[in-house]
Amino acid sequence: MKKQDRRPEILVCNDDGIEGEGIHVLAASMKKLGNVTVVAPAEPHSGMSHAMTLGVPLRIREFRRNNRFFGHTVSGTPVDCIKVALSHIMKVKPDLIVSGINYGSNTAMSTLYSGTVAAALEGAIQGVTSLAFSLTTYEHADFTYAGKFARKLARKVLQEGLPEDTILSVNIPNVPEADIQGVRITGQGRSRWSEDAIERNDMYGNPYYWLNGTLMLLDEGMESDEFAVRRNFVTLTPLSCDLTRHGFRSTLEQWKLKK
């Protein structure tokens, strides 16, 4: 059977865990396009970036929602989920991997910490066209428009494809569809976190710490994903698995370092 004559195989993952609302919206949306396989962390794994589990076994379990089979959980990270899904759970290679829909944006430097984005990048490493979707809120989330846009973009990407080792990181404002200003193709903005470790004491008086901080934007303009999404634009940012700063290589050559 030719690829265009069958329904595409779509793998759905996230980093918020299989009970997160976003993955249920995303899976339902993708089922209108193809055959969906859901493989997600058993527990939330936000901020895990491209971590994978070594030295301890991974456990795979079936997960039921409303008394119906929904997908599989993996006792590991989002990247573990992609690896296990491709090597063990899925019988055929997927045509598309979609990760999300994440609680909270994954823009600027937050991209580097994101398990949602890392799952999509792992898909690209494995040679599968991959997308990452994030909603710009941690509370009072309305995934309605995000699910609708995810399906629209996924359909287009299935038709057009993406360059090798490239994903799209998609950030969607948490506003009604009528308030969406449009779609912007952006770069990864510049930012940093104002880090703060909040100290508390346990029942024995021993200190422990919660990491906290605020994302500070270091550039402005509609070319920045964070700047644009704050102005209610959906942003599409092409990301590559190649982290090389190619423009700096010629400068390094001029250093003429010797062994």
UniProtKB/Swiss-Prot annotation:
Q: Which residues bind a divalent metal cation?
A: 15-16, 46, 102
The reaction(s) this protein catalyses? a ribonucleoside 5'-phosphate + H2O = a ribonucleoside + phosphate
GO CC term, one of those recorded? cytoplasm
Cofactor requirements of the protein: a divalent metal cation
Keyword Metal-binding on entry: yes
Major localisation: cytoplasm
> Is Cytoplasm set as a keyword in this record?
yes
Which molecular function term from Gene Ontology is one that the record holds?
exopolyphosphatase activity
Subcellular location per UniProt equals: Cytoplasm
Kindly list any coiled-coil regions of this protein.
none
The catalytic activity of this protein is classed by the Enzyme Commission as 3.1.3.5
Cited Gene3D superfamilies:
Survival protein SurE-like phosphatase/nucleotidase
Swiss-Prot/TrEMBL keywords? Cytoplasm, Hydrolase, Metal-binding, Nucleotide-binding
What is the UniProt remark on how the cofactor binds and its stoichiometry? Binds 1 divalent metal cation per subunit.
Which HAMAP family does the record associate with it? SurE (MF_00060)
What family is this? Answer: Belongs to the SurE nucleotidase family.
* Function per UniProt: Nucleotidase that shows phosphatase activity on nucleoside 5'-monophosphates.
Q: What is this protein called?
A: 5'-nucleotidase SurE
Q: Which organism is it from?
A: Chlorobium luteolum (strain DSM 273 / BCRC 81028 / 2530)
Q: Which gene encodes it?
A: surE
